[in-house]
Curated annotation (Swiss-Prot):
It comes from Stenotrophomonas maltophilia (strain K279a). This is Iron-sulfur cluster insertion protein ErpA. GO terms for cellular component: cytosol. Binds 1 iron-sulfur cluster per subunit. SUPFAM superfamilies: HesB-like domain.
Length: 130
């Protein structure tokens, strides 16, 4: 189960609306387990997975993932099984209600974003349009 993590010292009245939502983004157990494994390989327990949106790709926007040990004050932080997923407010507006998952199949393994806001996606699933 994912939980929203608030910033230390932040008051609910001062928090942006998205930070007070119960589940603005779903970070699955499968994704958290893979991230935890990758963080252990890196040897830095302060790392979190950051997901972001940037212009590009064949459909106009594309997803990006990176490890980050710096959390901005306005980042959304979602925790699942002790692993943190970070999203900046600009990216979150495109990811509201989305699910970040990790899948393995005969064709390979990958992080997958199931985004209800995307009108179209490319064949590989890494870019989308609104």
């Amino acid at each position: 189960m994912s939980t929203l993590v608030s910033l230390p010292g932040a008051t609910p009245a001062a928090a942006p609306d998205y930070q007070s939502l119960e589940r603005p983004l779903n970070f699955t157990e499968s994704a958290a387990a893979k991230v935890k494994s990758l963080i252990q390989e890196e040897g830095n327990p302060d790392l979190a997975l950051r997901v972001y949106i940037e212009g590009g790709g064949c459909s106009g926007f594309q997803y990006g993932f990176e490890f980050d040990e710096n959390r901005a004050e306005d980042d959304l932080a979602v925790q699942t099984s002790g692993v943190t997923l970070l999203v900046d407010p600009l990216s979150l507006q495109y990811l509201m209600g989305a699910e970040v998952d990790y899948t393995e199949s005969l064709t390979g393994a990958q992080f997958v974003i199931r985004n209800p806001n995307a009108k179209t996606t490319c064949g590989c699933g890494s870019s989308f349009s609104m």
